[in-house]
């Protein structure tokens, strides 16, 4: 359970990194510099900082590929977990559960797992947490 939560947190972190806005290129920075006719030192420092972001673009590409691999593995793990839970919970064969899971979308599978683990955690909570 702990590993599943950690893996889910990593997937969410990589999703944020992969979907973030790409950094401005050096060519675009030169255009901005010409348009704004930098007179203020703070603006020059800001543009220097943006010029350093080109390295981040390469890193984003690396994390984007890594994110795709992790996401693929996480999806496979979620499919297996959903099948396992259905077999145990509903008392059906593994093939029937696999057919049900295959018919579900990824979003439905995630919601099914969150609902299952949410109920499980709700039952395990300490009694003094009641409000």
Curated annotation (Swiss-Prot):
Expressed by the venom gland. One of its GO terms (cellular component) is extracellular region. Residues 21-60 form a propeptide. Residues 1-20 form the signal peptide. Insecticidal, cytolytic and antimicrobial peptide. Forms voltage-dependent, ion-permeable channels in membranes. At high concentration causes cell membrane lysis. Its main location: secreted. Keywords: Antibiotic, Antimicrobial, Cytolysis, Hemolysis, Secreted, Signal, Toxin. Belongs to the cationic peptide 06 (cytoinsectotoxin) family. GO terms for molecular function: toxin activity. The keyword Signal applies. It comes from the Eukaryota. This is M-zodatoxin-Lt8m. GO terms for biological process: defense response to bacterium; killing of cells of another organism. It is found in: Secreted.
């Amino acid at each position: 359970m702990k590993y599943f939560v950690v893996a889910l947190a990593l997937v969410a972190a990589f999703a944020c990194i992969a979907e973030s806005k790409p950094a401005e290129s050096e060519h675009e920075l030169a255009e901005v510099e010409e348009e704004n006719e930098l007179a203020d030192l703070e603006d020059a420092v800001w543009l220097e900082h943006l010029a350093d972001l080109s390295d981040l673009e390469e890193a984003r590409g690396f994390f984007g590929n890594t994110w795709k691999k992790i996401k693929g593995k996480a999806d496979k793990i979620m499919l297996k977990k959903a099948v396992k839970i259905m077999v145990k919970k509903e008392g059906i064969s593994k093939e029937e559960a696999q057919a049900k899971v295959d018919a579900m979308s990824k979003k439905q599978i995630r919601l099914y797992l969150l609902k299952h683990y949410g109920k499980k955690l709700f039952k395990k909570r300490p009694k003094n947490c009641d409000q």
